[in-house]
Amino acid sequence: MGRFIFVSFGLLVMFLSLSGTEAGVCCPFGWSGYDQNCYKAFEELMTWADAEKFCTQQHKGSHLLSLHNIAEADFVVKTTVSGLKDGVIWMGLSDVWNECNWGWTDGAQLDYKAWNVASNCFIFKTAENHWSRTDCSGTHNFVCKSPA
C-alpha cells in the first residue's frame, strides 16, 4: 500500500511539473514550454531596459520575448499573458533602425535624422496580435523567453 501511494504521489508531481509545457520541453517551475523554448509572463511594470535586465537574471539565456511566427505568438497569448491586465507587453525588439541604411525616395542620402530615438522599443499588443514602436522609458508588463 505504501509503495502505491509513493508511486501515485510521484506521478502526480511529474504531471504537475509538466502541465502547461509542450512534451519534451524541460522548463523551470512556473514557465511554459513551446518549440524548445520556455516562457514566463511577469505582472511587474518595468521600463524596457529594466525588464530586459530582469529577464537575463531569471534563467540562463533568458531575454525579453522574441516572436518568430504566428504559432509562437498564439502560444504566448494563450498560455502566458492571458492573466495580464492590459494585454500589452514588452518585446525584445529594439533599436532596429540605428544600423539600417535609410534613404529618401528621391535617392538622396539620409544625412539628417530627427526622429525620436527614445521610441526605439517595441510592445506586443496581444489582443490585436501586432507590434507597436514606443518609448523605451514607459512601463509595461513583459514576458521572458529562454532556451529550454
Curated annotation (Swiss-Prot):
InterPro entries xrefs: C-type_lectin-like, C-type_lectin-like/link_sf, C-type_lectin/snaclec_domain, C-type_lectin_CS, CTDL_fold
Record-linked SMART domains: CLECT (SM00034)
Pfam families recorded: Lectin_C
Keyword flag Secreted: yes
PROSITE patterns: C_TYPE_LECTIN_1 (PS00615), C_TYPE_LECTIN_2 (PS50041)
Residues covered by the C-type lectin domain: 34-145
Location of this chain's protein in the cell: Secreted
GO MF terms, alphabetically ordered: toxin activity
Regions annotated as coiled coil: none
Oligomeric form and interacting partners: Heterodimer; disulfide-linked.
Further remark: Shows greater sequence similarity to the beta than alpha subunits compared to other heterodimer snaclecs.
Protein name (record): Snaclec 1
Native organism taxonomy: Eukaryota, Metazoa, Chordata, Craniata, Vertebrata
